[in-house]
Amino acid sequence: MLHSGKKSVKISWGMEKILISGMGIVSAMGNGVNENLQALRCNCSGIAPLRYLSTAHKEFPVGEVKMTDEEMISLLQIPENQPTTRTSLMGIMAVGEAISNANLQLDKSNHKLKIALINGTTVGGMDKSEQFYTDFLTNDTKNAYIATHDCGACTEMIADYFGIFSQVSTVSTACSSAANAILLGAELLKSGRADIVVAGGAECLTKFHLNGFNTLMILDKEHCRPFDAARAGLNLGEGAAYIVMEKAKENSRSFEQGKEEIILAGAANTCDAFHQTATSPQGDGAFLAMKKALEEAGISPEQIDYINAHGTGTQNNDLTEGIAIERIFGANIPPVSSTKAFTGHTTSAAGSIEAVISILSLQNNFIPNNLNFKEKMPELSFTPNFNDVAVEQNGNLKPQKSELRHVLSNSFGFGGNDTCLIFSKN
C-alpha cells in the first residue's frame, strides 16, 4: 500500500461515492462528538498539566483524555480480569459512538454484511508494557503480558468487544496511521471487499512518547503555537476517533438527523523517505499527497474552503507544510488552521480525530481557530485562521465563511509518510 521514492497511492474513485454514515471521538476536548464540537466552537483547549500518566517529565503540558482506565472499564462494563489497554479502551468508546451514530445494529440483522474494522495505532498496549517492565524478569506470567500489548492485539480487543467485524486490520505508519486506515477502508469499499468499514485510530499517551519526543527536543513547555513565528514544539496528546464509511448507493440508514451528508471525496498517500523524523525542505511528500488527493477528488485547489493542517507546532513541520501549501494553492490559499492546540498531537490517532473535526466543520459551516497564534511566520505568505474576538455571547464561534463545501485534512508521519484526505458535502 505504501511506496517510497516520492510515489503515491491512487484510488480509482469512479462514480461511486464513499458516504460517511457515522463518527465517534474521544479526545482531550471531551468524550463524544457533541463535547468536541462545543469545545471547538468556544475555543476550549484540552491541553493541561499531566494528570494521568506517571512520568518524571511533569513540565510538559499534554492533551490527556479526562478519564482513568478504571473509569472507562466500568463505563464499558468490561470484566476486571479481562486484558485491556488504554488504547483499546478509548478505541472501544469511539467505535461505539460511531456505530450508534450510523444506526448500525449490533445484532444478526447484519450477519450477511462484510463489515471491516481498520485501526491505526503505533504504541498499542505499551502503557501496560511500561508498567510490567520492572517485574518482567521475576514474574512467571511474562508471556501473558506481552501477548496483549502489540498494536494488533489492541485492534482485536476493540473488534471482540462488538463482535460484528468480519475483517480486522491494523495500520501502523506513525502519525499518518489513522488517515491511512481511512484510505485503506475506502479501498476495501471500492473493490467490493467490504460493505461497511469502520476506520480510524486510537493512541494512548505513554512514557515512550514523552521520552522519545523529548529526545528529539521538539516538545513545548508551554501550549503549542502552530504556524507561529515563535513556535517552540508540540504538545503530545491521546485519543481515538473513527468514521463509518459505505458506498452511498448502498446506504439504507441516515446520518444524524438534520445533518448534511458528507463523503470522502479523495485521498492520497505518499512517501518521500527524506529523513527518519524530518520532512523535506520543500515539503515534497506533503505537496504530492495534496496534489494527488485533489486529482482523485476531481476538484481544483480553488474549491477547497478550509485546510485542517498537520500543524504540529515544530520548526520543521510548520515551515515545510506551509511551503507545500503555497506550492499547491499559490496566491489563493484558503483558511488554514491546526487543531492540535485543542487536542495535542495524538500521533497515530491524529488523522481520524482531525477527520472528525473536518466533518464537523463541514456540517456546521465553521472553521476552527488556530489557537495561541500571535506572530506571522516570515517565511510564509499566509497567516493561520485566528480571530481572538470570534466568540459570540452564547459561546459559539462565529462562522468564518457562510458555506463550506470541501475540506482538506493533512496527516504526516515519520519517514515521510504523508496522507491527505478530502471531505465534501454530497
Where do the model's predicted regions map?
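Feature captures the FAD/FMN-dependent oxidoreductase FAD-binding
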Residues: 87-110, 119-121
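Conserved small-residue
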Residues: 22, 40, 95, 117, ...
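ACP-dependent fatty acid/polyketide chain-elongation machinery
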Residues: 7-80, 249-263, 356-370, 419-426
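Structural signature of cysteine-dependent C-C bond-forming condensing enzymes
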Residues: 11-14, 102-118, 133-143, 157-168, ...
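Conserved catalytic cysteine-centered active-site region
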Residues: 9-14, 48-93, 124-139, 143-184, ...
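Alpha-helical metal-binding/catalytic segments enriched in His/Glu/Asp
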Residues: 182, 240-248, 355-359
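Condensing-enzyme catalytic core mediating Claisen C-C bond formation in acyl metabolism
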Residues: 16-21, 44-50, 219, 223-297, ...
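Short glycine/threonine-rich loop-to-helix capping motif typified by GTGT followed
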Residues: 274-283, 312-329, 346-353
